[in-house]
């Protein structure tokens, strides 16, 4: 197997790794976005280019006061080639759920699996406002962006982009502050955007937004003196399989 990297499923650099005969494109494209089951290749032993993304973590919800919750981290992406000679079982990583209880972290996203290959889900956003750390991965994998930190009477931090560095360069902004701090933005995956952090308020914080696409992290809830905002939900993972047959 050969590990490759690519930012989007329709931008995999096939010319750099596949024979010239594949220039006409795949003979079949399979996209799986939910559930579990079995994948059977069109051609036994045929070349498959595969991308897996784990589910994104849900955003946290803080305790009453000025400290907002952190955003959820995004799911990991892994790309590889394989020549399966039999059917492979698969399961899509579920979206992490944003917290709806005071002083509680969001849940982690589920791992996505195809055969023996797995893409881990992102960690849930914290109730304390600390960043939901990105998962450390090896070569051929792309780390999902970390969740942004919740603000302590201040604006929440933007979530991180896939790959993780530099921090706070993702698309999901932290929430604004008004006495209570803003929630941290969710991390971005290669194929999903994190949810924005909820806004803080002197009395009632707002909820973090849900992630979009595949594998994004949910936004952290905003802080409030009497009521804190819920965390936003992450988004589920997915599987992309491009089949090229006997090449």
Would you name each region that the model predicts?
Residues 93-158:
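Acidic, low-complexity glycine/serine/threonine-rich segments
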Residues 31-38, 52-116, 195-201, 206, ...:
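Glycine-rich strand-loop-strand elements at beta-sheet edges
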Residues 71, 106-109, 124, 144-162, ...:
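Collagen triple-helix signature
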Residues 9, 24, 64, 116, ...:
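Intrinsic-disorder/low-complexity loop/linker signature
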Residues 119, 214-215:
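Bulky hydrophobic/aromatic "packing anchor" residues in well-ordered structure
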Residues 1-49, 81, 238-247:
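Enriched but not universal
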Residues 56, 120-125, 220, 245-247:
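Short loop/turn segments at secondary-structure transitions that flank enzyme active sites
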Residues 13, 29-40, 87-91, 116-118, ...:
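Ser/Thr- (and often Asn-) enriched beta-sheet segments in non-cytosolic proteins
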């Amino acid at each position: 197997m050969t590990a490759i990297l690519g930012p989007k499923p329709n931008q995999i650099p096939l010319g750099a790794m596949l024979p010239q005969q594949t220039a006409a494109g795949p003979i079949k494209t399979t996209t799986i976005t939910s559930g579990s089951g079995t994948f059977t290749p069109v051609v036994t032993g045929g070349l498959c280019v595969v991308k897996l993304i784990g589910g994104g973590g849900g955003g946290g919800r803080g305790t009453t006061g000025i400290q907002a919750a952190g955003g959820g981290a995004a799911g990991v992406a892994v790309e590889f080639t394989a020549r399966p000679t039999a059917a492979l079982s698969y399961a899509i990583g579920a979206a992490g759920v944003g917290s709806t209880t005071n002083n509680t972290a969001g849940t982690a996203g589920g791992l996505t699996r195809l055969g023996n290959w797995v893409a881990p889900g992102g960690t849930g956003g914290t109730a304390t406002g600390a960043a939901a750390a990105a998962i450390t991965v090896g070569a051929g994998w792309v780390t999902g962006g970390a969740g942004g930190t919740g603000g302590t009477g201040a604006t929440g931090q933007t979530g991180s982009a896939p790959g993780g560095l530099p921090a706070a360069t993702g698309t999901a902004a932290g929430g604004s502050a008004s006495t209570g701090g803003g929630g941290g933005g969710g991390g971005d995956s290669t194929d999903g955007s994190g949810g924005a952090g909820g806004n803080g308020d002197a009395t009632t914080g707002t909820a973090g937004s849900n992630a979009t696409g595949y594998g994004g992290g949910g936004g952290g809830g905003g802080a409030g003196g009497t009521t804190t905002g819920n965390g936003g939900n992450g988004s589920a993972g997915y599987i992309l399989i491009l089949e090229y047959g006997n090449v």
